[in-house]
């Protein structure tokens, strides 16, 4: 992918900066909107060809900040980042245990997050018991048994898949901002463009019931559901 981008712009591209690619900022300034759209399409196709799947989450930040202090579960998580990272962890656990002999095959790799790394690691080593119901933990089952030990934190410049996660997050976030009226479209048709990119992203996602369960929610799944934007859950 980086080679494809390098060939397109005629100079080395060492990191996928999706905002710059989409908007036509340097180093993509000389490319036409159609050329940039084609490159974005190639990245989505690359993900599809390799059968990558996605687990995502989203939070209505205003709702979350206004109510977090009244949430008993929030005391165990502590920050918005940990709220989202733990939700992803639980969704991966729920998804992973649907496969046979898959125990301990999931490694969590995050972009560097200095302020949260230590506490999040402690959280995963000793998960709160309220989270067990999210994935219907069995009596003799170990907590988060799909997850390998502790999370890893890396510099996204050195890990291309982190950059691709950012790529997908960019379009999903822009879609949510436009659909909720939190941002205005910058050109005619941008809402439709973002709807298309969001659809491509969601087609890669694991079953929605592993992330935002529409009914029959336990308190843990309801906690994450209630703070998700209405247009994504």
Task: Please describe what each predicted stretch is.
Residues 1-233:
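Phosphate-ester processing/binding pockets and catalytic centers
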């Amino acid at each position: 992918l980086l080679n494809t981008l390098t060939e397109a712009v005629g100079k080395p591209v060492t990191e996928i900066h999706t905002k710059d690619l989409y908007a036509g900022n340097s180093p993509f300034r000389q490319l036409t909107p159609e050329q940039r759209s084609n490159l974005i399409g190639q990245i989505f196709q690359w993900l599809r060809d390799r059968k990558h799947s996605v687990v995502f989450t989203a939070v209505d930040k205003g709702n979350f900040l206004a109510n977090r202090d009244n949430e008993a579960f929030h005391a165990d998580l502590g920050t918005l980042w940990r709220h989202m990272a733990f939700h992803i962890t639980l969704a991966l656990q729920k998804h992973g245990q649907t496969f046979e002999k898959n125990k301990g095959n999931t490694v969590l790799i995050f972009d560097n997050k200095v302020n949260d790394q230590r506490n999040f690691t402690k959280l995963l080593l000793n998960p709160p018991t309220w989270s067990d119901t999210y994935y219907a933990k069995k009596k003799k089952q170990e907590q988060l048994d799909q997850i390998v030990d502790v999370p890893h934190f890396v510099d996204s410049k050195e890990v291309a898949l982190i950059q691709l996660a950012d790529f997908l997050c960019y379009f999903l976030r822009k879609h949510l901002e436009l659909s909720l009226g939190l941002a205005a479209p910058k050109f005619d048709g941008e809402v439709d463009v973002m709807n298309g990119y969001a659809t491509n992203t969601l087609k890669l996602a694991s079953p929605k019931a592993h992330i935002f369960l529409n009914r029959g929610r336990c308190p843990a799944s309801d906690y994450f559901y209630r703070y998700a934007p209405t247009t994504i859950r």
